[in-house]
Amino acid sequence: VTWSETENIKWKTPLPGDGQTTPIIWDDRIFLQAAIPVGGETTDFDEKRSTRPVTGRYQFIVLCLDRNSGDILWQKMVYEAVPHQGHHPSTGLAPYSPVTDGQYVWASFGSRGLYCFDFDGNLIWKHALIQMNIRGPFGEGSSPALADDAVIVVADHEDQSRIFAFEKETGAIRWEHDRDEPATWATPLPVKVNGRTQIVTSANNFIRSYDTASGNIIWQCSGLTSCAAPTPVISKGKVYCATGFKGNAFLAIELGHTGDLTGTDAVVWSNNENQMPHVPTPLIYKGIIYTFEEFHNRLSTYDAESGNTIIEGSRLDGIKQIYASPMAAAGRIYVPGREGVTLVLDASDDAAILATNTLDDEIDGSPAAIGNELYLRGRTNMYCIAAN
C-alpha cells in the first residue's frame, strides 16, 4: 500500500529517452517503448496546426526488461527521423503501449510504423502506416490491440482516417477501411460476442464495432464528444465509452445488437451531465465505475448497471494531474498522478484514500500488477514495487 524512493522498491531501472508506456508483462519479460532525442536538425513551428516545434532527431525504440531484476535484456531501434509534427510537452513522442501474445510483441509508433519482434528481440516484420496530421499540440497516441490472430491499428487524424487489421505472424494487411473521423487517441477494444470477436473503437462521430475477420461494421452509435481519448471498457455484456473534452458523455451499450444503435434500447444508460475524463480510461471494479477528471483531480463513481451516481466530483487531495488510467487490485484502486504521486484508494462506497505515495518521476503510463508486485513506468525510470 505504501512506497517511496527509499521504501518497498524491489528495483528501479533508469530508461533511455522518454516514454509513457503502460508496462506490458508476460512471464518474466516487461516490454516498453521510448523515444530518444539525438539532436541534429529541427522543424519549423506550424502555427496553422498549433503544434510545438520539434527540437531535433529522435530514435524510436522497443525495450525488454527482466521482470525479476529490472535489467534491460534488449533494446532495439526501429526508426530514426525528425518527426513531421511536434507535440505538447506533457505528451511526448512515445505514448504508445505494445501488445503481446507470449510469443511475439507488436509495437506501433504511429506515423513511424508498426513492428513485430520475438521475445529475443529479433525483428520479425515491419509495416509502414500512414503519416498522420494531428490537430493542436496533442501528438499521436492510440496503441495497437490484438484480436484473435490480427493486430488492429486505428489511425484517426485530420486527413483520411483509417483502421487496419494485420496478420499477426506475417504483417500482411488482412483488411483496411476508411473512417469518417477526426483525430482520436483511444485504443481499440477486442470483445467476444456470441463466439465472434468484435473490435470496438471510440471516436467523435460514432462508436463503431468491426468484425475482426472481415472489417465490416457490426454496429455503431453516436453520442460522444470530440477528442476521444479514453479507451472503451467492457463488463457483463456491456461496453462503456466516455469522453470529456468540449462537453461530457458516457454511454453504456449492450453488446449483441447490430446496425445503428443511436437512440435505441441498446443504449442502457447515458450521462451527459457529470464531468467525464478527457484522458484516463474509466475503471470498472466490482460493479462500480470509477472516473477521474484529470485537470481538477476529481473522482466520480457510478453503479455500472444503472448508471446511478454514487460519488460526484470528489476532489482527491495530494495529486495534481492524472493522465494514467487507474488500476484495481486486492480491493484497492491505484491512481498515478503526473507529478509522481500515486494515491491508493479503498474500493468501497466512499473510496477513502489509504495512502499517498511519491516517486521522483512523472507517471503517465498506467500501472500493472502481478502477484504482490506493482509496476510503474515513469517518464525516465521503471519501478517494481514490492513489500520488503
Predicted regions and their residues:
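Noncatalytic, solvent-exposed loop/strand surfaces
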Residues: V1-N388
